[in-house]
Amino acid sequence: MVTIRAEEISNIIRERIEQYNREVKIVNTGTVLQVGDGIARIHGLDEVMAGELVEFAEGTIGIALNLESNNVGVVLMGDGLMIQEGSSVKATGRIAQIPVSEAYLGRVINALAKPIDGRGEILASEYRLIESPAPGIISRRSVYEPLQTGLIAIDSMIPIGRGQRELIIGDRQTGKTAVATDTILNQKGQNVICVYVAIGQKASSVAQVVTTFQERGAMEYTIVVAETADSPATLQYLAPYTGAALAEYFMYRQRHTLIIYDDLSKQAQAYRQMSLLLRRPPGREAYPGDVFYLHSRLLERAAKPSSRLGEGSMTALPIVETQSGDVSAYIPTNVISITDGQIFLSADLFNAGIRPAINVGISVSRVGSAAQIKAMKQVAGKLKLELAQFAELEAFAQFASDLDKATQNQLARGQRLRELLKQSQSSPLAVDEQIVTIYTGTNGYLDQLEIGQVKKFIVQLRTHLRTNKPQFQEIISSTKVFTEQAEALLKEAIQEQMELFLLQEQT
């Protein structure tokens, strides 16, 4: 017979009492009333916050956007095919955030910061909210450093500074993405982190951009955030904010960043789709009333912070697509009013073989001139004026039969200047090479050449300067001024090369 020891039993009971942990877990839950088209209607979730993440029984995550009296409208971050009517949903108590780290450089990710390039997981210990407040007025300083795009037309006449928002706007197939990707390629060796956000693009187009970056060695300082045309509207809407959160992470670590949103028209369309399905009242062009706020809160995050916050910056180049050149549509006018200037790409110029097809007359940079280097200001001052006068004369010359000599000379000069601004894709130019090109054109050295010879001569002149007069490049890069010595070197090089070129052309 087993003897029962009272002391042993009391010890076991005491131990169990000490171990007892009365933990009350309160979970805010609800049930699915209806699901479809990327939207779910939930009954319950009484204490859910606007923008809070909710989790469905089968694992799908959603965002609570509409808080109504009898139900909650949730947008799904996935296809939601396994969600059933009547299944449970619980509030997570969190709002959308993503992991951030240096390890994201060189990777292709989706709007949830998950890698989609098949190269394994990305390690990150820090998190950042997708929606962060933009720096306030006191936290900013005015733009003063240049961000070189490598495109002569932009760097000379529509300069961009670090911390600026410059819109790239134009019809489809006018080279908007090409301008943006060339700008990223030109940041090589400039210590600038680039984020390229593709929203609603064809997967083949995104793959092509990524391949270009890899071939040109740009992927090592670039992050690509991609949500293609077949992605849920919620993820297309979130992608720009994910890109902005990653760029901000580097900006607040005193790094210069450049972010490209390609394009915000598609994000607005995704947001319109979500809003209409949530039965929010439609406004102009069926967009919801807060579509301006959608873009303003995104673009205001690009800034040049004050020196108290470090020497970082975040430059944004949003892209907007127009229909038949109509810049007075709702989304284009909204984004034009938010940004610090716009680069307008014209389908007519593109079809005429002028590429990049930048319409210099209506393109403007409101703050960039403060950031332009002195050397560029010195040589590019009269370029815009001469091109504007040429465009006016060209339109007039179509109706006039006999033109005087001065007008003919001005037309000839304008045609050669326009030829100088042509640049093939993925071939950005350094600042000193741009200065050489503009100076040669505006000072009439090309007037004696045929239009077809201009490009060839300029290429040879750049090579001649690089090999025989390297001190020219040293002067420009060290002083940032087009000094008398630099001008003398350039004039000498032009004369030497012109003699050589004319001899070659004669033989």
UniProtKB/Swiss-Prot annotation:
InterPro entries: ATP_synth_asu-like_sf, ATP_synth_asu_C, ATP_synth_asu_C_sf, ATP_synth_F1_a_nt-bd_dom, ATP_synth_F1_asu, ATPase_a/bsu_AS, ATPase_F1/V1/A1_a/bsu_N, ATPase_F1/V1/A1_a/bsu_N_sf
Gene Ontology terms for molecular function: ADP binding; ATP binding; proton-transporting ATP synthase activity, rotational mechanism
Keywords per UniProt: ATP synthesis, ATP-binding, CF(1), Chloroplast, Hydrogen ion transport, Ion transport, Membrane, Nucleotide-binding, Plastid, Thylakoid, Translocase, Transport
Enzyme Commission no: 7.1.2.2
TM helices/strands, residue ranges: none
Functional description taken from the UniProt entry: Produces ATP from ADP in the presence of a proton gradient across the membrane. The alpha chain is a regulatory subunit.
Record protein name field: ATP synthase subunit alpha, chloroplastic
Species lineage: Eukaryota, Viridiplantae, Streptophyta, Embryophyta, Tracheophyta
